[in-house]
Amino acid sequence: MFLKEKIYFYSLTIVGNISVTPYGKTRIMGIINVSPESFYKDSIKRQEDEIQDTIIRMQNDGVDIVDVGGMSTAPYLKTLVPKDLESKRLHNAISAIRQISNIPISVDTVRSDVIRSLLKLEVDAINDVTGLKYDKKMPDLAFEQDLPVILGAYLSNRENLYGDGDIQDTSSLLAESIRIANKSKIDDDKLIIDPSIGFFRKEGFNPFYSKTLGMDWYVRDIDIIANIKLLTSLKKPICVSISRKSFIGSLFGLDVEDRLIPSIIAEIYGVMNGVSLLRTHNVKETRQAIEMLEMIH
């Protein structure tokens, strides 16, 4: 195992039966999108057999958790859908998964009503890109259901623009989300933080991005990855979602299908600097890269 520098924090976080900790095994979260609007078309699985085949493949490739999304929140796309449609998509997908697997499932949504509609399907975590700030009912629901939450860095007040969304800004926004969670009595060991790569923009088409001034988003994203270790001061496990993101395309002029190698390099840099959970489209390649790092180090 790659021995990370020991980071003192409150407690490990359990998602289903999987522990997520800064100084333990790096965990892999595989992405399944059931929203046809999502930016990476190879991640879109809508039919039951497609979803089940993907789960089997991911498990064979070494996935720990799957993150299922029913609505794209990419800032640069017009992808908002009604919550009933999002719920229906997710219900069908998670039902298909539960027919064949007990793998821990995280639900990628900002809507508490969507989570509530899925509770009978045994979901294991909430992945909220707005860090409990968009839907005011989400914190209480997470507490009520004792669900771990991945808190995305998010600036909810569009009138109070941050200069760049740099690592200091990002840390402050995540600290705000931690305080919101604590106010709703969500235990610290239920929280994972995510710096929201790709979500800090000057302009966007939905309410789920953070509006900033100053540096362009792709410069900001590289700055966050370069300084990711500073987020360990928040004493929470860190999740990053770098896989095939648009900053890689902007930096290298690459289409989404050609962004694998830069994605893997950035992910491994994150692991070497305190990241505990990698949310990725590329489970097999990410697992191989982590194992190689463990052999070398």
Could you tell me what each predicted segment is?
Residues 7-9, 40-57, 73-92, 112, ...:
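Active-site-adjacent loop and "lid" segments of alpha/beta metabolic enzymes
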Residues 13, 65, 89, 109:
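Active-site loop-to-helix "anion-binding N-cap" substructures in soluble metabolic enzymes
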Residues 53-69:
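Catalytic domains of carbohydrate-active enzymes, especially glycoside hydrolases
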Residues 98-103, 122, 184-187:
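Short helix-capping segments at alpha-helix termini
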